[in-house]
């Protein structure tokens, strides 16, 4: 019955225009997109069912853009924007206003973007936008608060020192191509930011905080006309320096004809195997989504699947995989396997089985039914699922406004226009042993080094013999 439903949905949605928003009959929301004269792209969503109003600004700058001698500067600047503007110099003005109207705010710095967001009761939305917009027009960067906020960044860093996934991520960055920005330490601490000057903050701000590199999302019960008026009134003063989009070296991981293994000693009792492959950027392939197709095939759990085989052997408990972009220029495909104790002892057999399964995927033709099922489920979700409200939805939309064509923003996850066997096969071409690094995380693994910032113990080894084994394709009857 489920398959019949999916097939029926494919027939119904197959000829739909991918730009058309699929809506439930009772969905009375309205959307409008505008581009202000300063180049700022704006997405407006009005919904009478919302309980709160929310806004988000995404800026195309992140930890990859940190100067070599100022690791963490993008994150530090994110903190500093909350500490007063020329129009509202009181450092507590913004947070107090939001609190008085039942709201709050947040921000984060990622690899290639920074996002600021808030939510508030509808009656306080206009005033909140006035205060929020000044972050991007006239921040003070007051010297007296610099030391305080460096300590706040350092506290955030210290809080995460024992976080295994931050430790693993940091160690992984040590093995990308030498000199690539992926090697940079993103969070920052007293060591990297301790003597940062106001002029450094201002220069970084002027270099990257340009209206044409931003996306704004406003979500509220207020009308589209009201919100467009406020967007123009409060955000048109953001300066447009006509900065070009960031470009990063797509070759962030050098190919090497050997099996590369990183072993990490975790804080918690984790047993996990991660196999990663460097990819060109796939963000522009959002209409064909080859990474989702790859993940759907890899994550299949039924008879003949990789996970069912690993479970039968007593080696694995869980498996997840997929592919995506870190930036417009590069990304990665990865497979994460939760190991049993026996699987830990036989991790090479797990790696070999995984590569044999991937080779089987490669030898089969592109499976259009996978794309059609993903498309059908996405259409169902777009029509019937609750998309939520508040600042986290605003955050997602603002990021999409910044990263994708504005006409598709707000529904990137729902767009499945063209299955594109070419995109899918090109992705698979990068899933090779010479483009691979394997990370084994478990208590008791062999380690002989310590990472500087997190003091995490790890080791790195190469194995040419096992690499040659991986190149030999085994046809396993269990995968049929």
Each model region followed by its residue ranges:
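M16/MPP (pitrilysin/insulinase) zinc-metallopeptidase core fold and M16-derived inactive scaffolds
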Residues: 54-119, 162-164, 183-189, 300-318, ...
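Stable alpha-helical elements in mature extracytoplasmic
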Residues: 69, 73, 90, 94-97, ...
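C-terminal regions of mature proteins
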Residues: 21, 215-217, 369-480
């Amino acid at each position: 019955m489920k398959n019949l439903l999916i097939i029926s949905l494919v027939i119904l949605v197959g000829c739909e225009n991918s730009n058309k928003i699929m809506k439930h009959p009772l969905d009375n929301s309205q959307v409008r997109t505008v581009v202000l004269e300063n180049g700022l792209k704006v997405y407006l969503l009005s919904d009478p069912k919302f309980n709160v109003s929310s806004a988000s600004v995404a800026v195309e700058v992140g930890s990859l853009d940190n100067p070599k001698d100022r690791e963490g500067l993008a994150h530090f600047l994110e903190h500093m924007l909350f500490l007063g503007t020329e129009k509202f110099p009181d450092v507590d003005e913004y947070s107090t206003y939001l609190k008085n109207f039942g709201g709050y705010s947040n921000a984060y710095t990622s690899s290639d973007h920074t996002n600021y967001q808030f939510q508030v009761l509808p009656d306080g939305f206009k005033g909140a936008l006035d205060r929020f917009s000044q972050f991007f027009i006239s921040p003070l960067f007051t010297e007296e608060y610099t030391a305080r906020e460096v300590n706040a960044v350092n506290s955030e860093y210290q809080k995460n020192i024992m976080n295994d996934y931050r430790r693993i991520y940091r160690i992984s960055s040590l093995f990308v191509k030498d000199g690539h920005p992926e090697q940079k330490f993103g969070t920052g601490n007293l060591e990297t930011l301790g003597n940062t000057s106001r002029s450094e903050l201002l220069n970084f701000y002027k270099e990257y905080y340009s209206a044409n590199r931003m996306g704004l999302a406003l979500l509220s019960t207020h009308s589209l006309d009201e919100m467009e008026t406020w967007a123009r009134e409060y955000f048109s003063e953001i300066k447009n320096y006509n900065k070009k989009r960031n470009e990063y070296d797509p070759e962030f991981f050098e190919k090497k004809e050997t099996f590369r293994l990183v072993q990490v000693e975790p804080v918690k009792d984790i047993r996990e195997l991660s196999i990663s492959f460097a990819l060109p950027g796939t963000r522009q392939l959002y209409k064909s989504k080859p990474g989702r197709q790859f993940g759907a095939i890899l994550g299949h759990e039924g008879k003949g699947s990789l996970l069912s085989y690993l479970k039968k052997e007593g080696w694995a408990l869980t498996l997840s995989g997929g592919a995506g972009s870190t930036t417009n220029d590069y990304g990665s495909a990865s497979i994460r396997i939760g190991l049993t104790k026996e699987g830990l002892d036989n991790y090479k057999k797990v790696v070999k089985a995984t590569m044999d399964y991937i080779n089987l995927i490669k030898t089969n033709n592109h499976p259009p039914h996978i794309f059609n099922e993903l498309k059908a489920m996405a259409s169902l979700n777009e029509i019937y699922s609750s998309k939520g409200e508040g600042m986290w939805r605003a955050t997602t939309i603002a990021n999409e406004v910044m990263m994708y064509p504005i006409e598709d923003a707000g529904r990137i996850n729902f767009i499945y226009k063209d299955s594109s066997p070419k995109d899918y096969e090109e992705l698979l071409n990068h899933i090779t042993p010479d483009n691979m690094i394997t990370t084994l995380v478990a208590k008791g693994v062999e380690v002989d080094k310590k990472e500087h910032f997190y003091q995490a113990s790890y080791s790195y080894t190469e194995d040419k013999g096992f690499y040659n084994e991986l190149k030999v394709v085994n046809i396993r009857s269990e995968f049929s």
